[in-house]
Curated annotation (Swiss-Prot):
InterPro entries: CH_2, CH_dom, CH_dom_sf, P-loop_NTPase, SPEF2_C, SPEF2_D5, Sperm_flagellar-bone_growth. This is Sperm flagellar protein 2. It comes from Rattus norvegicus (Rat). One of its GO terms (biological process) is skeletal system morphogenesis. Required for correct axoneme development in spermatozoa. Important for normal development of the manchette and sperm head morphology. Essential for male fertility. Plays a role in localization of the intraflagellar transport protein IFT20 to the manchette, suggesting function as an adapter for dynein-mediated protein transport during spermatogenesis. Also plays a role in bone growth where it seems to be required for normal osteoblast differentiation. Predominantly expressed in ciliated tissues such as lung, trachea, testis, brain, and at lower levels in kidney and spleen. Residues 632-659, 883-949, 1233-1304, 1651-1695, 1781-1801 are annotated as: Disordered. Keywords: Cell projection, Cilium, Coiled coil, Cytoplasm, Differentiation, Flagellum, Golgi apparatus, Spermatogenesis. Residues 176-260, 321-395, 722-748, 869-895, 1051-1077, 1252-1286, 1665-1695 form a coiled coil. Residues 1-105 form the Calponin-homology (CH) domain. The keyword Transport does not apply. The gene is Spef2.
Amino acid sequence: MSEILCQWLNQELKVSRTVSPKSFAKTFSNGYLIGEVLFKFELQSDFSEFSESRVSTAKLNNFSRLQPTLHLLGVQFDQNVAQSIITEKPGAATKLLYQLYIALQKKKKTGLTGLEIQTMQPQTNQRLQALKSEAFRERLKNLIPRQTDFNLMRVTCRFQEKCKQMKEDLARMHFEKFEKIQKLEEEQRHFNIEKQRLNRRRQNEIMAKIQAAIIQIPKPEPNRTLKAIEAQKLMKKKKEAEDVANEIKKFEALIKKDLQTRESISKTSLDTIDQTAAELLNTYSDDDYIKKIQKRLEEDAFAREQREKRRRRLLMDQLIAHEAQEEAYREEQLIHRLMRQSQQERRIAVQLMHVRHEKEVLWQNRIFREKQFEERRLKDFQDALDREAALTKQAKIDFAEQTLRAKEIHEKIAMERAQQRYEKHYGICAEILDQILDLCTKVADYRLLTNNLIPHKMMRDWKELFFSGNPIYEQTSHTHGQTESTEDHHVELNKRNLLDSKDYEDYKNMTGEWALPEDMANSSPPSNNNILGHVLLRLIENSYPSEKEVADTELPSFAVKGCLLGKTLSGKTTILKALQNDIPIQVLSIDTLVQEAIQAFNDGEKSSKAPSMHEDVKGDPEVDQKEMIIPQDKNELTDTQVPGEAAPQKEGTKSSDFEQFRPSNSFLSLSMRAQLGAKSELMLRRGKSVPDVLLVNILVNAIKKIPVNQSWVLDGFPMTVNQAKLLEEALTGYKRKSLQLKKKKAQMPTLALSPTTSKEVPFLPSAFDFAILLDISDNSSLARINDIIAKEISHEISHENVSGPTITSSEEKSEDRNLRDHIQHRIVGFLDNWPLLEEWFTEPRNILKKVNAEIDEAFLCQKIKEIFATEVSNKKIKVEKKLEEKETEKKSAVSPTEPPTPTPPLASEAEKEKEVHQAKPSGKGKTQSVSPKGKAQGGKISVKKSPIDSTEVSPTLIAMPTTKPGSEEWVYVTEPIPEELPSFLVPYWELIEKTYISHIKTVLRQLRESQHTVLSYLYETRTSFQEFLRRPDHKQDFVSQWQADFNSVPEDLWEDEETKAELHQRVNDLRDRLWDICEARKEEAEQERLDIINESWLQDYIGITMNHFFSLMQAEVNRFQDTKRLLQDYYRAMESRIPLEDNKKFTRIPLVQLDGKEISEHQLRIPLVPRISSSPENVSMRPKVKALLKGRFDPPLESLEANFEGDEKIVLDTWQQASLAISQMVAAEVHQRLAEEEKEQPQLDPKEKSPQSGTNKKAKKEKEQAKKEKEQAKKEKEQAKKEKEPPKKKMAEKKGKGKSSPVVEVSPVTITPEEMAEMERKNELKLKIKEEHLAALQTEEQATQFRLELIKSKALSILEDLVTKVIEVYRFMEKWLGKRYLNEMASIQKLTEVARYHIETATKIQNEIYLSQEDFYINGDIKVFPDPPPPTRPPPVEKEENGTLTIEQLDNLRDQFLDMAPKGIIGNKAFTDILLDLVTLNLGTNNLSSSWMHLTQLDLQEITSLLTVNTEFVDWRKFLMVAAMPWPIPLEEELLETLQRFKATDEAQTGTITFEQYKQAGLWFSGDEDIKIPENPLEPLPFNRQEHLIEFFFRLFADSEKDPPQLDYTQMLLYFACHPDTLEGVYRALSVAVGTHIFRQVETPMLTAEKTSISSVSPNEEFPEAEENSTREELKEEKDERDQKEEEIPENANTEKISMETLLKVFGGGNEVLDANRFASYLKTENIYSENLIKTFQDLGAKNLEPIEVNILLKHPYIQDLITNYVDYKIPDIKMILQRSEHAQGSDGERSPSRLTDEKK
């Protein structure tokens, strides 16, 4: 039944789902297919409301709609049946479908529809059915569970099934586990059983062997003779006797144990027991005891005999049998004992034989096992060889991969380093570029400020900032209240200091801005004050005396010191080993030294003299200060608890790993090397690297142990600059010496240079004589480590099965592996540190030598040896030269010790003081604080003088030196000075220099910044005045109002003369008003200019600038005063005179008072003068100012000129005042010198007369001298002051000493020649000091005067330049004002002319007239009244061209043909009649073009024949397509591309598209033509024919009956496949139908019949020759193309399949169409080729007409003939007929309508 229903549903009804018997209930459970079945029988009208879903709501909906229909058919259906079907109850759906099948078959027989059946039902039944349906729906809703409940139930069921499945899996797992356990137990039980079986079998075999070894001896028969019986009795008695003896032994043993408690039982041996018991008993010695035993034995024997008697009597028979048994047993025992020995021997023999057999088996087994061992060894050896080969191969692969990985890592690191270098270089370049841009923008800004004339000084400052790398623009403005300093502020301070230093250098050297002006070009700048420089240098050297140089008693060493550096594996150690073998040098490797130090600590190496920590460890200040304790045992290092180690370390404190050490006797007793090793081991145990300080200490300690004359070389050390510095400091102490050198250089004077070079610190020797770099590339280093590892791997693999390597080789391997792991880091570390190291070794003196280490090892060793030999020879030459210098120094030191004149021996200290008092007058006596040198030199003077000699010496004192002081030949006075004098004068000179430089820099900075202020002020003045001139005015308002009034005049009044006169008057009024505005603005501008000129800025700025230059003059004057005082104190101290009292009232240069306020004198710190010159002479005006003011009269500028002249006078007065003050100072100093000499001159006479009166009159002379000095001091000073206490005290002391000195008894002595020479020398010295002092003052005066004159010239030039710039700006302001006024007046004149022109021409002014500021123009962009609207352009109109039908005509023809024949096929006679009617009845209709109006009936018939399909019908669509030409004929490729676009647009693949889709896809040509828009707006646009043709083609081929119209694009493209060549057209149509290009199989000849027919119809004389030739050329080209295509046919061409329907669509021209009238509602079509095509398909093997390949189809003769003769795809040439008709009409004249009517009839 189910199969029948399935067949009915699937085949007859063809339901949407395939129904199978297995899924029948499930398929119909939702009721959808039941509704579909009813719908197919037109019973379920609401089938669209059915749902295919399986949810509860869908099922309820479906079955609720099914219930009325099933009830109508009489099928039994209620909620129970529905529930059964929904729940997929077996048989429910089948039963319902069977009932439905029967009911539908009945209905089918009746032929009634559902509506008819329903109408046949009574009305009451229908209402009742509606109620039943509603009730059914409610009941069914209650029966069917909700979808959510159903979903929950399904989820529950799913999880229940999952739970059940998990339980089953768990039970299965337990069962499997239990079975596994049972299986294991069973296997164990079987194993135990088998084991027991094997054991039993082995035991049975052993028992069998034993049994087989037993020899069975036959038992002899019992001997029943008396002799045998007696022997048995005897044996029984012996046995009893033995038993008794044994019992007795036991008893005696017990007795002995009781008697001898805790004693050892002595070994006793009893003699062999006799055969009888009596003999045994008699052996005991105790008689009583023996008697008792004998008695007891007798009693026992008697009792036993009685018992035996009774037993014999009672049991005689049993006794006899028992005795017999006993006898038999005894005999057996006896025999057994006798035979036991032989059995044991046989058993031993059997066992021996068994052992021999076992030995033989073991021997055979051993031989077999040895053979197996031999085979195994051979196999293992072969396996080892194979494994070694495999491991070697794998190791090579791994090593190659590792090498490649290491190379990639190295390349990556190199790329990163290159990237870092690039980024650094890029950053530097970017910074430089930014600074260049800043400089350019700064220059551009200041070109705007200065009118492209940037001051030279400003440009120099910017260049200086640019070259120094400082930003040109200001970074921040640091106000006075701001306290915190930022980075930008530091940058600004650095910039300011740089520019200040540059300005000071220019000022000092008189370069740049401070170069000599033209008026001072003839005067040379002052030279350096050599005397002052010498004085300062001597003071500095005395204030910081140089340390005494200790003479080296030892000879300099010939040892060469160097270091060998390079990358890892560059060959340093190898080269040094080879060098050490050939040359006696000591090689020091830091790694070896650290290991030896650690080993020394572990070995507890003791020091021989126990040095202290502070003496030995010099390079480690931390270790010197921190105490440490280290136990001797190395294991105690980790266990020792360091105090405070766990406490957190505070920030800012310097942590040191040696803080935990404390001094201990055990540690201090260690050697220095051991102590350093302890610290190194501690650092290494903590996982840290050994510090550089510790490494250097270890290295220095090792160097100290090397002999002095032995050379040494360091292996790979130092590695960083820090290590190099520490090593240099430890070996040479360069840091301390360099600091001394810097300190001494910092104290050298800068204002006065010494003529002689100061004693510099000698050149600091380096710690090394040479440093060699083994240069090697990174790749070579990596290649060497790879070679080492490769050799190591091969060695390991080859010796893997041999005994393990030694400890040394394992350590080397670990070192190599460690080196390989860190080779990249080492290379990178070397590359990072080497640039600084290279700079360290090459900066002071180049000791670095680079050697290429990638050469051969022997050649490299030879090269290093040559370098070392060269260094040894150089060192030898240096040492010999040094020795020669020392010898020469010793000789030169010995020669000056012998003076040319004899000197008296040195006296004692008391005698020295005495001589000093006698030789020196009280006014110039020396104090006690004179240096020893001074005392020694003063002590050389003798007190013994004669008056005669003194008179002879006096003429020699007047002699003058020939050399000039300060020159190169001048010998400077170096008399001793007091020790405390340099400590006062050196700081005083430093203060002078510091104050002078600071003052000069501050003033120059103010002048520099004021220059920027001037430029900014002048620029702001110019711009503000220009903006003032450009301020807005109200002229445009008046102009706009006038224009509005002018345009508002009516047009009819334009020609009136009175109106014109009125308009001219209005123009005049406007002009006058505008002139008034311009005059007012001019006056305001002039007042603004006067306000700017009358500002006090220029006067204030000139005053400030003058004060700056006066400050410079003050600085020079102050410096001169301070220098004069310093020289005075120095030379007076050298003459042992008392310094003069300090005069604090220095010369002050007054400044200019800027404002006119009067200030009281006590409020002034600096004197001020008014802006009025005190000099009466006139100062001539500068030429620049005079040139600017020449020929012009401007009162404000004249006032500026007068002010400038007064300022010049003030500058000159101030300069003269400063110059005069300096000259007066020098004159006063010279006068003071002369006065002192005059005072000293009279004192020479008393000394020469008699030295005796010196002791008595000494005090009086001292008092007189003091009074004279006091009066002289009062004259020189302005304020009277009392004498200071120190001079009084000194005089009192000298007076006291003079009184208390012992009176020497003097006799008249004549003056010796030596005393005369000493007096001459003293006078010469005084004269030399005076000359030197005055020369220094004069030189300083000249320099100061020159500086003051330079400042004066600079001040005047700057003031002149400033006034010139300001006057120039004021002149420009006047020029701008006048120019603007003239431009405004010219603009007003132009406006007046334009207005008068428009008045005279009587035209309005449409464009806006613009008059603003000084500009006048007519704005063409703005119109005051709108233009008239432009005329509208007419729509485009298509014109007839060359007889072509217009789009409108084509649409009219289409509408007529569509009404006549909607399917496109029309009879040829009807077609001809329609055309004839259109031609003859075209009066006023314009249905055809003019060229068609000349066609005759014959011509129309010829056109019809060209379009005829089957001699009866015409395709009017093809006619319209041809009539619409010209249009681009598509190529085959274009047709296929258009087809693909249509198919892509047709998503549903229905074969039809709408107009929107058609427009979206487009044809092979587009309607976007280049249309030229005509310039004339009244001319219509050109007509776009192609765009309209595309739309017309859609209307032509679309099915207009559908809404919206649908276009069959394949059918349309078949129309366009037509071609002038018939064969080409057919192939094009096939290609369009198939969708791909179809190649021609065979070449078919051209259809000549058609040509002949056409030629016969149209004679040659009717065709133009040009067209005929062009047609032939086109056909020839097409033929060539076709031939070329045929030649290019690929092998697998035309493999596409084509169906019968497609083929019939292509050859559809054979359809027989009946379309007799326009009212036919359908057409009857039949293709005449269908039968032949079906037969062709069957012939080709397609029995069921399935698609076949095109190439197979084209080979069939019928298809070839059909393609050759099918002419429907040829484009008919209608144009030829039209041209012929026009030609004939031109010869015959126009036809009349009557004639046409006759022809029609």
